[in-house]
C-alpha cells in the first residue's frame, strides 16, 4: 500500500499528540468576558463540573454567584436571572450554579474547589429541604454530578484547612463509585503528602483544556430564554412582592392548596408524589 493513504492518519495522530502535551494555560484565554456572559445562565456541564469558568467568574467583578439545584432552571419570571436582567441597572449579573441533583454536598465541593478565590466575595445559597433525606445524596446523583476536576482542585486549595479536607474525604468515601479511594483514605487519616494527587497532573491538564474549548461551543437554549418578564427593572422590593403574590395566585387556581397548576396536574395524574415527609430528616448525612 502507498504511504500517501496513511498521511491523514499520521497527521491526525501528530496533532492529537501535540494537543495532549500542550499546557492548559495556553487555552485559558478562550474563557473571555463574553464566555462568562454566555455561561452565567447556561447550566451547562462544562460550567457546573469544570474549574476554569467558575475560577474566572470569581476573579471577575461582574457577577453574583447563586448556588442551588433544580429551581435555578425553572421557567419562572421570578428566577433571579430574569429579575436582575438589566446590566445597566445592576452592577453584578446573577451567575447560576446548580441543577437537578446538585445537593449541598455538590455545591460544597464546587465552592471548596474555588476556596482560595472566595475571600471578600458575596453569594447566595438556595437550600432545598428535599436534599436532607435519610440517605442524603444518592449514588446515582453522585455519579452524575460529582466532578473529579473539582475534587482535585479542592484537595489542592492551600488555605482550606486539613480538618475540613478530612471531613470531605470521609463523606466521599461513603459513595461506592468514588474514584481513587486510596488517596481519600489517606486524606481522611491525615496522612497525605505533597506528592499525592487525587487526579494526575496529566489528566487534570486534559480536563482543563477540554473545558476551555467546550466553553465556546454553541449552547442549547434553556427554558429561561423563553420567559416573558412580568417585572420592571426599577420595581421596588414591595412592588416585586406584590407582583409575585399576584402571579402565584393566578397560576394556582386549580386547587385549594395553592400549588402551581401545572404541578397539581402532575400530582393528579400520579406523576408526582403527594406524601414527601421522608425527604427531610434532621439526622440526614447532608447536615
Predicted features and spans:
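Short, basic, glycine/proline-bearing loop/turn elements
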Residues: 37-40, 92-100, 276-280
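Hydrophobic membrane-insertion alpha-helices, especially the h-region
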Residues: 4-25
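Secreted/periplasmic serine-hydrolase-like ester/acetyl group-modifying domain
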Residues: 33, 155-287
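A conditional alpha-helix N-cap/helix-loop micro-motif detector
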Residues: 45-46, 104, 285
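Membrane/wall-proximal cationic-aromatic binding patches
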Residues: 29-91, 110
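Short loop/turn segments at strand-loop or loop-helix junctions that form parts
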Residues: 67-69, 125-130, 261-272
Amino acid at each position: 500500500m502507498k504511504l500517501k493513504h496513511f498521511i491523514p492518519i499520521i497527521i491526525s495522530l501528530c496533532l492529537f499528540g501535540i494537543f495532549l502535551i500542550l499546557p492548559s494555560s495556553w487555552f485559558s484565554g478562550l474563557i473571555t468576558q463574553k464566555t462568562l456572559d454566555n455561561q452565567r445562565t447556561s447550566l451547562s456541564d462544562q460550567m457546573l463540573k469544570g474549574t476554569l469558568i467558575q475560577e474566572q467568574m470569581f476573579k471577575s467583578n461582574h457577577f453574583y454567584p447563586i448556588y442551588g439545584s433544580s429551581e435555578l432552571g425553572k421557567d419562572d419570571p421570578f428566577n433571579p436571572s430574569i429579575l436582575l436582567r438589566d446590566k445597566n441597572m445592576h452592577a453584578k449579573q446573577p451567575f447560576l450554579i446548580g441543577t437537578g441533583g446538585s445537593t449541598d454536598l455538590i455545591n460544597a465541593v464546587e465552592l471548596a474547589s474555588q476556596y482560595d478565590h472566595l475571600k471578600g466575595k458575596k453569594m447566595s445559597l438556595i437550600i432545598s429541604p428535599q436534599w436532607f433525606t435519610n440517605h442524603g445524596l444518592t449514588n446515582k446523583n453522585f455519579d452524575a454530578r460529582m466532578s473529579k476536576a473539582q475534587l482535585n482542585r479542592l484537595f489542592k486549595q492551600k488555605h482550606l484547612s486539613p480538618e475540613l479536607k478530612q471531613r470531605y474525604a470521609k463523606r466521599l468515601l461513603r459513595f461506592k463509585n468514588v474514584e481513587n479511594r486510596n488517596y481519600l483514605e489517606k486524606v481522611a487519616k491525615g496522612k497525605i503528602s505533597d506528592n499525592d494527587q487525587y487526579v494526575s497532573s496529566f489528566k487534570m491538564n486534559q480536563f482543563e483544556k477540554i473545558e476551555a474549548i467546550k466553553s465556546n461551543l454553541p449552547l442549547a437554549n434553556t427554558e429561561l430564554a423563553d420567559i416573558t418578564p412580568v417585572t420592571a427593572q426599577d420595581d421596588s422590593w414591595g412592588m416585586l412582592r406584590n407582583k409575585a403574590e399576584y402571579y402565584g395566585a393566578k397560576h394556582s387556581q386549580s386547587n385549594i392548596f395553592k400549588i402551581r397548576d401545572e404541578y397539581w396536574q402532575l400530582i393528579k395524574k400520579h406523576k408526582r408524589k403527594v406524601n414527601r415527609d421522608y425527604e427531610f430528616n434532621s439526622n440526614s448525612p447532608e447536615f
